[in-house]
Amino acid sequence: MNCDLQQISKLKSKLGEGIFFDGSAVYWVDIESKRIFSSNKEFNVILDFIPSVILSKIKNRLLVGANKGIYSISPQTIEQEITFENIFDSSEYRLNDGCLLRDGSYLLGFMHQKTHNRKIGGIFHVSKNKNITLLDWNCKIPNTFIE
């Protein structure tokens, strides 16, 4: 990886989360400023949605978990398109973290947007066929999923 750490340290985030390494670049989101940053200094984009986590990079497109679903973003054109919405349809909750599993399904954790220290959140499994299963509804801030 050709990475300029001094350049990366200049990229300031208010609430940086969701780090992802694709083998050549590091990507992360800033939830508060609705941005994606990258160690590739040419890809720093402001989004139309609130990002939470970079789930994967498939066919040169980033899969980004966000408040309204999963988005696909082209680092080359900065085109943003939603690929799956209404996983958990609630204006009070947002996707906080997740991962793409080897079988093409997702584990996704949702938390309350405003009172996450008092209200519980949940973990969902979303199959390749987009079947949604609630696995657990007993964690306040579901975080760090690793297969």
PLM segments and residue spans:
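A short loop-to-beta-strand structural motif that recurs across blades of beta-propeller domains
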Residues: R35-F37, G69, G121-F124
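A short, charged helix-loop
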Residues: I120-W137
